[in-house]
Structure formats: structure tokens, C-alpha cells
Amino acid sequence: RWIATIMVLWGIASTATMFATGPTSLYVLRILVGITEAGFLPGILLYLTFWFPAYFRARANALFMVAMPVTTALGSIVSGYILSLDGVMALKGWQWLFLLEGFPSVLLGIMVWFWLDDSPDKAKWLTKEDKKCLQEMMDNDRLTLVQPEGAISHHAMQQRSMWREIFTPVVMMYTLAYFCLTNTLSAISIWTPQILQSFNQGSSNITIGLLAAVPQICTILGMIYWSRHSDRRQERRHHTALPYLFAAAGWLLASATDHNMIQMLGIIMASIGSFSAMAIFWTTPDQSISLRARAIGIAVINATGNIGSALSPFMIGWLKDLTGSFNSGLWFVAALLVIGAGIIWAIPMQSSRPRATP
């Protein structure tokens, strides 16, 4: 129900942005959008831990997060056509954009309120046998976790306050690693069309929108493959860190040549690596945080790490103004990804005993 509430409020705030009349009202409304959406991703990630055991969670995360490249691809194509509605019913194109892309969240939130069950034991569509089987899987999942060297023991975890459990070096390392990742995610969502425009001078907005959809389509396939590979191998550390480096290589490739096809290949690599890393990244923090602190812990990592999504647009824009090209901004994002990969490899992680998965 909390997820449904967030979606409705988020949709209302996003739609209300169409009524902005100046910089002040726009800033206030955008801050309101940020406040209403803040709990959505942590809430979904926590919700998935109630339904899927750790050995299946990379795929579960990926299937949920596939929505990001899907909406980015569709948004790149659809937004150009929505903006062409400028003047219809006395509304400007940008107002139609907020209305048609914000209001569906309200409708979907209402549907979620009635259709999405809070936990397996409340799911009417599951039989008693299904509920029992799923609960046994979740119980066994908790028992098979192996403590790595340097991790907090269960007894010690029970003796410390929830806040002391959250603000540990391990959680802070996760936060820094996520900060490095959100920089590239922001660069993909905000700057890809403009980067492609700089590579393809003279192309129309619709053409650029279609080109911007290509990396996202490739990303969908890459995310699903890499998450399945991680679940089959029951390995998280390398499956998280390597996509960081793959994305960094993509940004460097895009900045190193003037050949359009190679630049597009670099952006595709950056998109696949970034989103694949994100899907598997979120399978790991919950293994270092107890159930009682999991919701707040995930929220802390998400909220603090998301500062990177605000830094990246500023830095890339500033460096472009300073140098006259996107290259230095792409180097900045690539450097953060390399640092993030190093942090991931340095984090002590729990693991599950290997088991076959479908």
C-alpha cells in the first residue's frame, strides 16, 4: 500500500509541474516531485526481498529495472511527438509532456493499491502449499548466508542499535559505490540525446530520439542476460564490478573517436554496463543489513548515493562549457565508475552456498 501511495503522490506532483509559471514555482514543484518519489526505489527493493530469495534476486531486480531503459527508449521517441501538441487546447507542448507522462502514474498507483499484495502470506492467488513452499525458500535463504571476514556477527548485530548498524564502514562503502554509479545513470538519461546530437549535427529531434532509443533496447537484453548469469553462478561481487568497468570503457570509447558508429557503440556499452551493475548492486546491501534495519539502510544508500545524479549533470555541463565538448565530462564519469568498481571489490560480502537455479 505504501508503494501505491508513493506512485499516486508522485504522479500528482509530476503532473502539477505543468502549472509552473516561473523559475520559483518550477523549483518548488520539482523539489516536491523529488520528495514524493524518494521512497519508491527503496520500497520496491525491500518489497522484492519479501518475495524472492537471494539466489533469484538479481533476475527479479533486473526485470523490475528493465522499466528504466524501456521508459527511456519510449520517452525518447514519444516525447518528441508530445511536444508537437503545442497549442492544442491552449496548452504548450511542455505542459502536455508533464500531463501525459505524469498522470498515468496516478492511475497505475490506484491499480497497485488493489492488486499488489503486501507479502506472500496475504496473496489470495497463492494456494496454501505455494505459500508454505515460498516461506520455506525464504527461511532457508536466510540460513544459508555465510558471513565474510570482517562482517558483523548475528549476535553482535542484535546488541547494537539499528542506527549504529546502518552507519558502518560497509554501508558507507555501498553508498560511495552507488554514488559513482548514479553519476553515469544520470548522464545516460539526461545527456545521451545531446551527446548524440553533437555527434550527428543537423539531425532532427525525432531522429535523435530514435537513435537514443537504440542503447536502451540493447540494455534490456544485456540486463536480463547478465542478471541470469549472476544468479546461475551465485556470484555478486565480480558481476557488479565488471559492468562498472564495461560502462567506463564505453564512455572512453565514445569520447575517443569521431566515427559515429563507434561513438554509438560506446554509448551502448555505457548503458548496458550501468544498468546491469545497478540490477545486481541491489542484491548485495541487504545481505549486510539485518531485516529490522533493511528498509532504512536501503533508503540511506539510495538517498545519499543519489547525490551523484545531481552532480553529474552539473559537472558534464560545466566541463562542456569549459572545453567546448562532451569528452572531458565523459572522462569524469568514466573515472568515477573505475573508482566505484574498486570500492565494490573492497567490500566484504556475504554469499550463499551454490545451488542450481532455473
Listing of model-derived features with the role each one plays in the protein:
Residues L29-V66:
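Cytoplasmic helix-loop-helix junction between adjacent transmembrane helices
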Residues Q95-F114, L330-A346:
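Symmetry-related core transmembrane helices of the 12-TM Major Facilitator Superfamily/SLC fold
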Residues Q234-T284:
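C-terminal transmembrane helical hairpin of 12-TM major facilitator-type secondary transporters
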